[in-house]
Amino acid sequence: MQLAKPNSLTIEDFHEVSPGFCTRIHVQMRRYVYRIAVARSQEIYEAMRTEPSTVCFSERDYAWFLPPGLDLYKMQKACELFHGTHVVGSFFLHRDRDKRKEQRRGEYVKAIRYIEHCGVSKGEAYAFDNDLYDYYNVSVYSRSFVREQIRRMMGAIIAHGYDRIPLSLIKWLLANPISDNFWGLRLRVAPPYGLHLVDVSYDPVDFVNPNPYVDNKVIVVGEDGTMKERLEKNLDAEKEERELDENDEEDGDGDELLENDRRIVGSSQR
């Protein structure tokens, strides 16, 4: 990354951790932000396709461009429906090949997720200020997500913001957690380039006393000075790690839920 874009990566802090600590399994909270750019007029929105401005190029990989008319109040009402614990099967890209794999193993992915917070806030331009678009952030806090969950949530939230679907339809999707229901209603999955992982939080106790203890790969130096890689299997941790791998998507949201009363939420959206 530093070669492609110098000075784009900095180390702000580091911690010494136990050999049994896992950066994925021991996560307490993840904070994702989905950025949207709403055109201030229909002319500006249509010109994006025929005569794109410098703003369009600067935001191309960082926000979802939308036409004017988005109702923020309705968006917020849709966001609030996701608070709490839900079976989010309707917002889960559950592919047939994954279902067959689960059937062979006799292990099935859980789609129960706890959403700490989902809400809309004022955003800002990525590169430079302009008078063409209004920027907004949809922030979602949870320990873990299923594949495509946030992008499907955003598709439903935006659809209600444009008054294309009623709130009752989102409630129905939450009450009828089947993956095919989302496509059956012809809802659009939000594009991936607006989604950003902003913060990952851990309980400092897990740095030194991780629970569960994960047997990571360890480099052992022998008496003759040779180095060997050792991996001792922890079956419970290995099973959970496998479930995490099978539910990851390109943006990294797909970890198995572990109920824990200690929830550490990252700093508020800047």
Feature-to-residue mapping (PLM):
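Structured-RNA-binding interfaces characteristic of tRNA pseudouridine synthases
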Residues: 1-270
